[in-house]
Amino acid sequence: METPKPRILPWLVSQLDLGQLEGVAWLDESRTRFRIPWKHGLRQDAQMADFGIFQAWAEASGAYTPGKDKPDVSTWKRNFRSALNRKEVLRLAADNSKDPYDPHKVYEFVTPGARDFVHLGASPDTNGKSSLPHSQENLPKLFDGLILGPLKDEGSSDLAIVSDPSQQLPSPNVNNFLNPAPQENPLKQLLAEEQWEFEVTAFYRGRQVFQQTLFCPGGLRLVGSTADMTLPWQPVTLPDPEGFLTDKLVKEYVGQVLKGLGNGLALWQAGQCLWAQRLGHSHAFWALGEELLPDSGRGPDGEVHKDKDGAVFDLRPFVADLIAFMEGSGHSPRYTLWFCMGEMWPQDQPWVKRLVMVKVVPTCLKELLEMAREGGASSLKTVDLHISNSQPISLTSDQYKAYLQDLVEDMDFQATGNI
């Protein structure tokens, strides 16, 4: 008979009580707060002992068999975190994973007595919460099959409750009915340089005159008709105003802005940022706004400088805000870039009064937000990830959040210089 997969919380409490895994320990006498080592797998000083808790859970859950399967620390850690994500009786109390000397996370049980509750082997209900497996009438029969024994620490008054293995039954797990999560983080493929696609929309005095969606692995350039087409970055030519505007003076001014673009405004992705650089004479200001309007009631986020690159979007805070959004923050992260060409940013005027406004939407970021909205706050919902030239991947909301958390950790690790 196949051994049933253990539930994460009773298993974790037992590991904490045993105290045999390096760095895994209770932090208070009431045993409600505990620490888990959280070192990045690519650190130069990383050793297998640093990932003992993740490997132990991988073995206990049947995801890894020593000598048979290839060790995969990142997958072990992601599966462990995904299992904890859907436990409402737990919360992350402190994230010290960036500590250069002792990277770890602190968790705590948020409900008084929850630690003892999960130790009794409570099973999850359909909402991811905990419920007792037996009614009060059946409690005497339940305790007949239990052996009460002291904890390893003889000075403690707590008692460990160990069930007779023959009495254990496998608990239903919604993840058993879903597609298994891919070993590699699929979000890295979605955000790979060759996957960056941009939806570009241009407005002349508030009127939409151009929209195009295009793959730009090396970046793009917003240009007029006089640009050098042999330069790097894919040229996106803004249309002549003649066929769109009736006011002769406005057409003339728009034409001057387009001519002043020269070799264009370049936008490209490198590392975890989007970068912009102005190659012509026309000044340009940028801001992160909503997809339907540029939030012109405030000042710009910055100016695009001539012949000097500058970051206009950072993926790290976007992903962090996306995780917070999934956890119920209510704040939807922004990803739409607006550029005002040839004039000051419309801080005190309606944006539709500006001669040339260009909106750029990275479609991969839009898709990430849509996936978060589809999953919502429910760990039981699934989201489909669509990547070019591949089959859609179905993920639970918890798996999706775990992959996002992986991205944040990787970006933090790269930002600290690979300690």
From Swiss-Prot:
<dbReference type="GO" id="GO:0009617">
    <property type="term" value="P:response to bacterium"/>
</dbReference>
<feature type="modified residue" description="Phosphoserine">
    <location>
        <position position="378"/>
    </location>
</feature>
<keyword id="KW-0597">Phosphoprotein</keyword>
<comment type="function">
    <text>Key transcriptional regulator of type I interferon (IFN)-dependent immune responses which plays a critical role in the innate immune response against DNA and RNA viruses. Regulates the transcription of type I IFN genes (IFN-alpha and IFN-beta) and IFN-stimulated genes (ISG) by binding to an interferon-stimulated response element (ISRE) in their promoters. Acts as a more potent activator of the IFN-beta (IFNB) gene than the IFN-alpha (IFNA) gene and plays a critical role in both the early and late phases of the IFNA/B gene induction.</text>
</comment>
<keyword id="KW-0391">Immunity</keyword>
<keyword id="KW-0496">Mitochondrion</keyword>
<dbReference type="GO" id="GO:0032728">
    <property type="term" value="P:positive regulation of interferon-beta production"/>
</dbReference>
<feature type="modified residue" description="Phosphoserine">
    <location>
        <position position="123"/>
    </location>
</feature>
<feature type="modified residue" description="Phosphothreonine">
    <location>
        <position position="237"/>
    </location>
</feature>
<dbReference type="GO" id="GO:0005829">
    <property type="term" value="C:cytosol"/>
</dbReference>
<dbReference type="InterPro" id="IPR019471">
    <property type="entry name" value="Interferon_reg_factor-3"/>
</dbReference>
<feature type="region of interest" description="Interaction with HERC5">
    <location>
        <begin position="194"/>
        <end position="353"/>
    </location>
</feature>
<feature type="site" description="Cleavage; by CASP3">
    <location>
        <begin position="125"/>
        <end position="126"/>
    </location>
</feature>
<keyword id="KW-0238">DNA-binding</keyword>
<dbReference type="GO" id="GO:0005737">
    <property type="term" value="C:cytoplasm"/>
</dbReference>
<dbReference type="GO" id="GO:0051607">
    <property type="term" value="P:defense response to virus"/>
</dbReference>
<dbReference type="GO" id="GO:0019904">
    <property type="term" value="F:protein domain specific binding"/>
</dbReference>
<dbReference type="GO" id="GO:0045893">
    <property type="term" value="P:positive regulation of DNA-templated transcription"/>
</dbReference>
<dbReference type="GO" id="GO:0001228">
    <property type="term" value="F:DNA-binding transcription activator activity, RNA polymerase II-specific"/>
</dbReference>
<feature type="modified residue" description="Phosphothreonine">
    <location>
        <position position="246"/>
    </location>
</feature>
<dbReference type="Pfam" id="PF10401">
    <property type="entry name" value="IRF-3"/>
</dbReference>
<feature type="modified residue" description="Phosphoserine">
    <location>
        <position position="14"/>
    </location>
</feature>
<feature type="modified residue" description="Phosphothreonine">
    <location>
        <position position="75"/>
    </location>
</feature>
<keyword id="KW-0010">Activator</keyword>
<keyword id="KW-0399">Innate immunity</keyword>
<dbReference type="GO" id="GO:0050727">
    <property type="term" value="P:regulation of inflammatory response"/>
</dbReference>
<dbReference type="GO" id="GO:0060340">
    <property type="term" value="P:positive regulation of type I interferon-mediated signaling pathway"/>
</dbReference>
<dbReference type="GO" id="GO:0000978">
    <property type="term" value="F:RNA polymerase II cis-regulatory region sequence-specific DNA binding"/>
</dbReference>
<dbReference type="InterPro" id="IPR017855">
    <property type="entry name" value="SMAD-like_dom_sf"/>
</dbReference>
<keyword id="KW-0539">Nucleus</keyword>
<keyword id="KW-0051">Antiviral defense</keyword>
<keyword id="KW-0832">Ubl conjugation</keyword>
<dbReference type="GO" id="GO:0010468">
    <property type="term" value="P:regulation of gene expression"/>
</dbReference>
<keyword id="KW-0805">Transcription regulation</keyword>
<feature type="modified residue" description="Phosphoserine">
    <location>
        <position position="135"/>
    </location>
</feature>
<feature type="region of interest" description="Mediates interaction with ZDHHC11">
    <location>
        <begin position="140"/>
        <end position="419"/>
    </location>
</feature>
<dbReference type="GO" id="GO:0060337">
    <property type="term" value="P:type I interferon-mediated signaling pathway"/>
</dbReference>
<feature type="site" description="Cleavage; by CASP3">
    <location>
        <begin position="121"/>
        <end position="122"/>
    </location>
</feature>
<dbReference type="GO" id="GO:0031663">
    <property type="term" value="P:lipopolysaccharide-mediated signaling pathway"/>
</dbReference>
<comment type="similarity">
    <text>Belongs to the IRF family.</text>
</comment>
<feature type="modified residue" description="Phosphoserine">
    <location>
        <position position="390"/>
    </location>
</feature>
<dbReference type="GO" id="GO:0043330">
    <property type="term" value="P:response to exogenous dsRNA"/>
</dbReference>
